[in-house]
Amino acid sequence: MNKHTNKKKLGALMVLAYASCAAQISANIAKDCAAPLAGGYTGRGVLIAIEDIKTITQDGSNPRIITAIELKAGRKLSVIDNVFSPSPLTGSTTQSNTDDGMMKFRKSMVLQVPVRGADASKDIVEPSFQAPLGYLAILEKKDRSGDGSFEAIGFEQGLTANADGITRNEYENGGCTMLTMSCNETVFEYSFFDTDYDTTKTAFDALLAESY
C-alpha cells in the first residue's frame, strides 16, 4: 500500500534507507478559481470500528489518500445522519499540538445523537468509548471538488469519546446527546478519494449500504 519507504538488504538484516522528514511548502497558497472552497459538512458520514476493517488501501504516491475500505465478512458500520441540524458537526476541529513532545494534530468530531433510551445508551453512547481500537470516521463535506470532499478521521489512532465528551441537556440541541470523539494523528488531513468526486461518492454510498 504505502510505497514511499525504500528498503535494501544488508546480509541477514533488513535496514531502512535514510529518508529525511524535513519538507518545505511546495504549492501555491492561493484560491482555486475553477473549484472554490465550500466550507461545512453535509451531516452525513460513517463510523467504522477499526477491528471490523479487513483492508484499507492507500494511494501509492500520497498515502494521505485512502482509496478503498473493505469490512470483514458479516461486519456492519454505523451511519452518521446529522442532516437535520442547521449546522451539522459544529465544533469539529483539527488543531496542531505537541502534547507528547512531537508535532501532531488533535482532531475532534462532534455529533448529535438524535435518539434516546436504554437501547441508544447500550448500542451508541457507551460503545463510543469502549471499542478496543476506536473508530474510523468518513465525513461528507459540502465541497464537491473531489480530493478533500470526504474527510477521514481516525486512520492512525482510532477515534474514541473524550473523557468529558458525552453530554445532554434537555433544553439544548433538541434534547440530543452531544458526542465528542477525538484522536491524535501525525497527518493534518486524510482524504477518502478515488479518481474523481463521482467515483468517490459512489464508493461512499456503498459504505452507507453496509450499515446496521
Across the structure, where does each feature detected by a protein language model lie?
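Intrinsically disordered, low-complexity terminal tails
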Residues: 1-2
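Structured, beta-strand-rich domain cores
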Residues: 86-154
